[in-house]
């Protein structure tokens, strides 16, 4: 947040600014995630999973950049509500369970599927503002994903889906390596039976890479905004450079950049099927 503030980006509301939709740390929003989890459980969409990552990797097909599609080892034959308080404390061979979303038991709300192009109820689709029409088969490409980890932490997919809705987000913009996550998060929102007109639009942008084609990442000790700031780079210089690289105006003025912005400039529209 300090880096973004240095770059000149401000927020309508947030951790520093405050606002009506707080708290703004996910660690302070557990009650909201638990409420969503309880609702999904009432529909029989959760089950405990005792598998380790090593066991899953040994038998599961690979799902793009986001790990493995769970093979359903612990999935029950029928989706029924769990006694969450009991199941969370029930160890098996010394392991406590994660809670997974039961994709097999999931059915789209009728109003949701009536507004999507696909007639196959095992296929999820949405329009990405950059990559065009996206589809994924729920069983083959999405699978049963974790909603709560075995250590009790609410998983990324659940937290992001709930936050994006409750913050009334109009757009979710993130890296193209998270396209599969969007299918999962939209599935959560559909299972929560939320109105389609209150679901965000999604845009996945290409990743920033170095000269060798490797994406910039902390683990690779790649350049960071903090490093540029500490070496004396001026924020207006960086803003102007980024604007030119992205085909914007030759200016460091954020309002000018925003006024010149259009999704159509970056649309690839090729679509993909998973």
Descriptions of predicted regions:
Residues 1-65, 176-196:
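N-terminal Rossmann-like or analogous alpha/beta NTP/dinucleotide-binding catalytic cores
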Residues 2, 35, 58, 76, ...:
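Charged/polar, solvent-exposed surface patches and flexible loops
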Residues 7, 86-92, 96, 106, ...:
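Non-catalytic terminal extensions that flank enzyme cores
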Residues 8-17, 165, 203, 218:
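A short alpha-helix capping/helix-coil boundary motif
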Residues 11-16, 196-202, 249-254:
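Short, surface-exposed acidic
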Residues 13-30, 49-62, 84-100, 233-249:
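Hydrophobic transmembrane alpha-helix bundles
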Residues 30, 53, 67, 71, ...:
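Alpha-helix initiation and N-capping motif
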Residues 48, 54-216, 224-229:
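Active-site cores that bind ATP or allylic diphosphates and position pyrophosphate for catalysis
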